[in-house]
Amino acid sequence: MSDKSNCAFGAELEHYIVQKMVELGIPASKSKGSGNQGQIADINNPYFIVECKNKSTESITVDAKVWEKLKSEVPLHSKRLPLYVLRNKNKQTWAVMDVDDFFTILKGYLENLNGRV
């Protein structure tokens, strides 16, 4: 893939994630420069610091250095959670987060669900 096609491939994933967040009522937009020009993340929103990565392979792996960098970019005392979004060449897409953050979200969801039943 050329650099231009890689850039377009990345923009497509970022657009997809922004669209999904907006559909849920979350104010979200793509960051200028996709997180590399003074922006913390690829996508601006109030809940997550999102890093999007496209892979030109079928199998994907979580790059520990990218994950550590993403976690280190969370501002002190911020409630925003790091979220690493990966997509393979077949457009299968995964969201990776810290397991403790996942269980915190799940607990809140279940408490809300039980309160409405």
Residues covered by each model-derived region:
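Catalytic phosphate/metal-binding cores of nucleic-acid and nucleotide-processing enzymes, i.e., regions
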Residues: 1-117
